Amino acid sequence: MVASMATTYELRIYGNVECAEFIDKVESLGKLLDVNGVVYVYKDSVRILANFPNEKKRQLFKEIIKDLEDDGGLIKVERIEERDLNTYIEFPNGLNKISTNELKEINKKLDKTISYLENIFNALEKQIKVSEEIRDILKDTFEV
């Protein structure tokens, strides 16, 4: 399905916004307004690449994002920068988060698993050498 707007927009949201709660709220808002795209944390901002169904929903999306701050100060939107990418990127339905933290966590777990496997293989190699030495000793002891 081709969107009625012929371009993809990039929104950069600055402030205290790099938390999972804010990302989840943005993702839910996008789905509510039929926005297709991705949302992710990048350096000092949250970035959104999105296709909006119409201009009214694009403006509404930005206005609601400004109001997503919480009373405790954990989420604070300082400013939103918008850029028309002058191209159309086709996204799956909905606004979907890309979690670099999840990828980092998976990589950490893989690194740890590789380390465990290396330790196991090293221990097995040592055990094989010991078993071969014991076999040779027993062979020499019981040879007539």
UniProtKB/Swiss-Prot annotation:
InterPro entries: Acylphosphatase-like_dom. Residues 8-100 form the Acylphosphatase-like domain. It comes from the Archaea. This is Acylphosphatase-like protein MJ1331. It comes from Methanocaldococcus jannaschii (strain ATCC 43067 / DSM 2661 / JAL-1 / JCM 10045 / NBRC 100440). The lineage of its organism: Archaea, Methanobacteriati, Methanobacteriota, Methanomada group, Methanococci.
